[in-house]
Amino acid sequence: VAFDEYKVKPQKGDLFMTRIGDIGTCAIINSNDDLAYYVTLSLLRPNKRVLNSRFLKYVIESKYGKKELNRRILHTANPIKINLGDIPKIKLYLPSLQVQEYIVSILDKFDTLVNDIKSGLPKEIEERQKQYEYYRERLLSFKKS
């Protein structure tokens, strides 16, 4: 079967979101390569003029996003799932694109610090070293009598 026969092809910047089982886990598509995906995933294509893909990912994976998804889950299904038609019903607060990009830049930095052992761990060690030196100097600085 040729990819041309499919209605929707994933594009760079789109998101895959799990919709069966572990609902709401997202991945951003980083290339325009032809991809096939299974029914357990939904393809989300944000309107780039009003919605940043990374912002959408962070919102969906937040407590708020999980709560919104949970309101539309078919809890009687086994495994639990959300219907494709219910995904657009999720209520999202959309700040301006500029604010979204600012929020994403902050969250990306935290994500790197927490999840990237090559940059996060050395940065954490450096910060703890500074903290140690600060407290050492404070604790060992005695007033002259």
Predicted segments with their positions:
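Charged, alpha-helix-forming regions
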Residues: V1-S145
